[in-house]
Design a protein with these regions (language model features):
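Mobile genetic element proteins and their domesticated derivatives, centered on retroelements
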Residues: 17, 31, 51, 73, ...
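Surface-exposed loop/turn segments and immediately adjacent short secondary-structure elements
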Residues: 1-87, 99-100, 152
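Inter-domain linker/hinge segments that demarcate the starts of reverse transcriptase
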Residues: 14-22, 50-57, 107-109, 135-146, ...
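Catalytic-core region of right-hand nucleic acid polymerases
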Residues: 38, 56, 90, 103, ...
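Catalytic palm subdomain of template-directed nucleic-acid polymerases
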Residues: 162-179, 253-280
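Active-site palm subdomain of RNA-directed nucleic acid polymerases
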Residues: 105-123, 148, 224-261
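Catalytic palm active-site di-aspartate
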Residues: 31, 70-73, 89, 123, ...
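Conserved catalytic palm subdomain of right-hand nucleotidyl-transferase polymerases, strongest
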Residues: 27-35, 73, 83-93, 133-177
C-alpha cells in the first residue's frame, strides 16, 4: 500500500487542528516563532481554522516554511568541567506551530508507517504500543529460554553516536519512496529535511548562526519516526549473519544461540562477522 491515493487530498479538518492545539503541553518550551504553547492551547478555538488552512497550503505547495527551519539550542550541562563545551548536551527548541502542523499531517503519515511495518518488526522505540520495557522483556526471556535449554549465547550490542544528526537526507527520501510514501506528502517531507539554521542561546544571548543539514532534526515531531524508517534496514546484515535483533531507537541488540559444545573461538568469529556486516 502507498499513501499516493490520498496524497492529493488529505482531509485536514479544523476539528483535527482544534484537537492538536487543545492537547499541547503548556510547559513545552517556546521556540523561535515566539508564541508560547500555553497561548496556542488557550486560543485553540480561534486558531483551528487558520492552522488547518495553513497545513493544507503547505501540503499543496510541498514547501515547509523557512521561518520554521530555525532552531534555538540550549546547552544542558551533563557532568565534569563546566567550561568544556563537550560536557553539554544541546536541547533543541523549535517553533510550536511547526510541531502543530507536523502532528496534523502526521495523522496520515504515522498510521501508514505502522500499518506497513515501516520501522521493522523489532523496533520498540517511538512505536505505538511498544516501549523499552517490552524490548527488555523480549531480550531477557529469549536469553533465559536458551540458557534453560543448555545453549550458549553470543551477544553484540551497538548504538549510533549522534544518530539523529547523521542521516543522509537524500538516502532517507529514497527509503521512504520504497516504503510507499509518494506524492504531496513526500514533497513536504523532502522540504522539511532541507537545510536549517540554529543558534545557541545562553541567558538571552545568541551565538552566530550555524547550519544544520542531513539530520532528522532534534526537537521535532517527525524526527523519531523518520529515524526509525531510516534505520529499519540495519537488521538486514544482522539476519544475514544468522543473528536475531531487537532495536530501541539507535540501540541495536544482536544475539544468536549456539550448542553448548561449540568452542568460544568459533562464537567470536560469528560475532566479528556480524559486526563486520553491520559496518560494511
Amino acid at each position: 500500500p502507498t499513501v499516493e491515493r490520498t496524497s492529493n487530498f488529505l482531509p485536514i479538518r479544523s476539528r483535527h487542528a482544534k484537537e492538536v492545539l487543545k492537547n499541547l503541553k503548556e510547559d513545552s518550551g517556546t521556540g523561535p516563532d515566539l508564541p508560547a504553547a500555553k497561548v496556542l492551547k488557550h486560543c485553540f478555538s480561534s486558531l483551528a481554522i487558520p492552522v488547518a488552512m495553513l497545513a493544507r497550503l503547505i501540503l499543496k505547495n510541498g514547501i515547509w516554511p523557512a521561518m520554521w527551519k530555525v532552531h534555538w539550542i540550549l546547552p544542558l550541562y551533563k557532568k565534569k568541567a563546566v567550561f568544556d563545551a563537550a560536557n553539554y548536551r544541546g536541547v533543541h527548541l523549535t517553533p510550536q506551530l511547526s510541531k502543530v502542523v507536523e502532528r496534523l499531517l502526521g495523522r496520515f503519515l504515522l498510521p501508514f508507517f505502522e500499518a506497513t511495518d515501516a520501522y521493522g518488526p523489532n523496533q520498540f522505540a517511538y512505536a505505538k504500543g511498544k516501549g523499552c520495557k517490552d524490548a527488555l522483556a523480549t531480550n531477557v526471556l529469549q536469553w533465559i529460554w536458551w540458557l534453560h535449554n543448555g545453549y550458549q549465547i553470543a551477544l553484540y550490542c551497538s548504538d549510533v553516536s549522534g544518530a539523529f544528526d547523521r542521516v543522509k537526507a537524500t538516502k532517507l527520501v529514497e527509503k521512504l519512496q520504497k516504503k510507499g510514501v509518494t506524492g504531496d506528502i513526500l514533497n513536504v517531507i523532502q522540504s522539511w529535511l532541507g537545510e536549517r539554521e540554529a543558534k545557541v542561546v545562553v541567558n538571552g544571548t545568541f551565538s552566530k548562526t550555524a547550519k544544520l543539514n542531513n539530520m532528522v532534526f532534534q526537537g521535532t515531531v517527525w524526527g523519531p519516526p523518520l529515524w526509525n524508517c531510516f534505520f529499519e534496514d540495519a537488521r538486514a546484515p544482522v539476519r544475514k549473519s544468522g543473528f536475531d535483533e531487537t532495536v530501541f531507537a539507535d540501540d541495536l541488540n544482536c544475539f544468536k544461540s549456539f550448542d553448548k559444545d561449540v568452542p568460544n573461538p568459533k562464537i567470536m568469529t560469528s560475532l566479528e562477522k556480524c559486526q563486520s556486516n553491520l559496518q560494511s
